[in-house]
């Protein structure tokens, strides 16, 4: 078990109870982080000829399992190595978005006009999670969070797992392609809170429409389609 690199219990409690008072925004924050990861891969594709992805290839997927009481947000973005999981998720309030924006600005400043395809798009890359705390909003609704990630260009996948209290573990995992899955194991329902409602088609679609319409990439989710069945007249 690894320990958070800050006063985790106090700071995590402060973030959950003070910074975020509206529990349902956890999904907005996870989708924002997924959008970050996709942005980073798209940026890499503009400057690295070995990364062949187009904007239309990139997407975010939201899923749920009502029996297991889980909500999953997945992306096919840049992914994270073991060290990056430790750095980005092990340090509360650390954000690599600032570092990414600095690298983005440096690349744009050093490039010649027309040097890289679509380099003008660099100024249009949105970085949402600048403060590095949004991910931890998942612990407002989750008793455990598991992050499975595989970095672009790597054959290895790693899983970061924590209950938000006693530190975290990082272990080898399996993932077919680059990207990240964030699985939130919902807390048990109480007299005041019905966390299980988040693990439903209706609950998630409402939150996506309410909070995440600004995301530039497609947000996919399997939905149940119903149709009227004609009954024969007697």
Residue ranges and their predicted role:
Residues 1-194, 198, 206:
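GHKL (Bergerat-fold) ATPase N-terminal catalytic module, capturing the glycine-rich phosphate-binding loop
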Residues 129-131, 211-213, 234:
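ATP-binding glycine-rich phosphate-binding loop
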Residues 153-155, 227-230:
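Short, surface-exposed beta-strand/loop "edge" segments at domain boundaries and coil↔beta transitions
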Residues 168, 202, 217, 231-234:
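GHKL/Histidine-kinase-like ATPase module
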Residues 201-217:
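Short, cationic low-complexity segments
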Residues 215-227:
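A short amphipathic beta-strand at an alpha->beta junction
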